[in-house]
A protein has these predicted regions:
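Structured-RNA-binding interfaces characteristic of tRNA pseudouridine synthases
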Residues: 1-241
Length: 241
């Protein structure tokens, strides 16, 4: 079999998440529908699942198949995927490459705007926050998450799964009234990025204190800080190998 690395982008507003579901449109479901038609016999892997409404600038797949994947075939795949999914690039790669298990870093970007001015044309990709945002305050809290930590208070942790993750970058930037949060880590727990964004927005709004947040990082007590930011502001930005 030959192994192909494929980078795709998608508009999450069109899907109920990445992972295949019965009778609901998902990114994986659409991809498999097209591959079943054009390739038939294959194994599909992906770098990670995204929730309903979450977008991707670069989601990475690997496809193991006996069929030779050419530019022409990729063009046909891209066309059949429709307007909400696009193939960025593809290349043949060694058979030991796995889109998920070979990944070293993943970067997500969260986009939000404060309540000073509504921009309706951005609502599918940018969260409209209901209060003013303070860049200095947001970056004060974002630095807490750097390094290795137990994030069990900031995510939905599956049974017997190690809740420790390492964060390499955690920073907010502002352009006009658009605030973007960039986070890079070795991997993320379920809902972790949206939960971290939600906690930071709650801190911005004085609903949580620095002490409360830090205590759950230093000594998680099983009580999740359940502040989940809306999915529409989140984009899987890049996967590094």
């Amino acid at each position: 079999m030959q192994n192909y690395k494929v980078s795709i982008a998608y508009d999450g507003a069109s899907f109920y998440g990445f992972q295949k579901q019965k009778s609901r449109p998902t990114v994986q479901g659409k991809i498999e529908e097209v591959l079943d038609l054009l390739i038939k016999d294959y194994e599909l892997n992906y770098s990670g699942r995204t929730d309903a409404g979450v977008h991707a600038k670069e989601q990475v797949l690997n496809i193991l198949t006996d069929i030779k994947i050419t530019e022409k075939l990729i063009s046909s795949i891209d066309k059949l995927l429709g307007s909400s999914i696009s193939v960025n690039s593809f290349n043949q790669i060694s058979n030991d490459f796995h889109a998920r298990y070979s990944a070293k870093e993943r970067t997500y970007v969260y986009s939000t705007m404060d309540n000073q001015k509504k921009l309706p044309y951005l609502l599918n990709s940018t969260h409209q926050h209901n209060s003013s945002l303070d860049l200095e305050k947001l970056n004060e809290i974002s630095q807490l998450f750097l390094g290795k930590n137990d994030f069990s208070s900031f995510a939905k942790v599956e049974k017997n799964k190690n809740p420790e993750r390492e964060i390499f970058k955690s920073v907010w930037k502002k352009n006009s009234n658009i605030f973007t949060y960039t986070i890079t880590g070795n991997s993320f727990l379920r809902n972790m990025v949206r939960n971290l964004v939600g906690v930071q927005l709650a801190f911005n709004d004085n609903k949580l204190t620095l002490k409360e947040i830090k205590s759950q990082l230093d000594k998680p007590d099983g009580n999740r800080l359940n502040y989940i930011a809306p999915a529409n502001g989140l984009t899987l930005w890049k996967v590094k190998y």
